[in-house]
């Protein structure tokens, strides 16, 4: 089976964040995308939601510069802003003014735990895929610090880290509310997890209908295509 790539599924997570913002009628809502890479999620958020201020946080210089150029070329400087920062330092540094004020935080963090056995822990690919500069708990903690009460945190990760995600969420006051498992094709073992947490939310978890990415012929499923509309 073809492997689900991280970037293909992130719009599903993103659109759920947009639905939350629209449902609340937050014309002046704020959104932050952690591990933003080249900034595609803030750009899509600017198109799909009514958030007035959208921020992206990226640790790698090259990706950060590309994200800034994209905003400039699209004339979105009034709504979208990027910060070059490690997630562990963001809420006490450049992002201190955003603490407890954000409505929606999204995050597509590195999936692989630790640096054990890595030959080049500083390469761009390694930083993007492995927890070299920050761990899972750091991303959850940062989201909790940014969100206002009842704000929503949406994360993409691997099913193997589900327990770690839930433990970190409760540790920092983010209650898991919705969970969706994603598989490459119908009937195959899920390899992606979508989770929605709420700051100070009640203790009730809803399992959403599983999502398949590909049809038997290799094309995207209708449900996934709808995420891109």
Where are these regions (language model features)?
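Generic structural signal for residues in well-ordered beta-strands
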Residues: 1, 80-82, 176-179
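S-adenosyl-L-methionine
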Residues: 1-26
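A general structural signal for well-ordered alpha-helical segments in protein cores
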Residues: 13-16, 38, 42, 124, ...
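Conserved SAM/SAH cofactor-binding pocket of Class I
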Residues: 21-118
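Mobile active-site "lid"/loop adjacent to the S-adenosyl-L-methionine
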Residues: 109-138
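Conserved Class I SAM-dependent methyltransferase catalytic core
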Residues: 133-190
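SAM/dcSAM-binding transferase cores
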Residues: 187-229
């Amino acid at each position: 089976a073809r492997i689900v790539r991280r970037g293909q599924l992130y719009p599903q997570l993103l659109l759920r964040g947009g639905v939350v913002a629209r449902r609340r009628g937050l014309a002046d809502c704020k959104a932050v995308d952690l591990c933003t890479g080249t900034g595609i999620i803030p750009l899509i958020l600017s198109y799909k939601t009514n958030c007035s201020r959208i921020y992206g946080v990226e640790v790698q210089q090259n990706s950060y510069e590309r994200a800034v150029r994209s905003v400039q070329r699209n004339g979105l400087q009034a709504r979208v802003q990027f910060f070059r920062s490690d997630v562990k330092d963001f809420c006490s540094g450049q992002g201190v003014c955003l603490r407890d004020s954000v409505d929606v935080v999204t995050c597509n963090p590195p999936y692989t735990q630790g640096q054990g056995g890595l030959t080049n822990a500083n390469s761009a690919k390694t930083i993007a895929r492995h927890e070299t500069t920050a761990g899972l708990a750091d991303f959850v903690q940062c989201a909790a610090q940014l969100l206002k009460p009842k704000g929503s945190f949406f994360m993409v990760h691997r099913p193997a880290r589900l327990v770690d995600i839930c433990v970190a969420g409760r540790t920092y006051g983010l209650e898991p509310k919705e969970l969706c498992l994603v598989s490459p094709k119908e009937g195959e073992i899920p390899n992606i997890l979508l989770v929605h947490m709420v700051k100070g939310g009640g203790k009730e978890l809803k399992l959403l209908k599983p999502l398949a990415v590909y049809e038997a012929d290799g094309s995207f499923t209708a449900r996934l295509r709808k995420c891109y509309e």
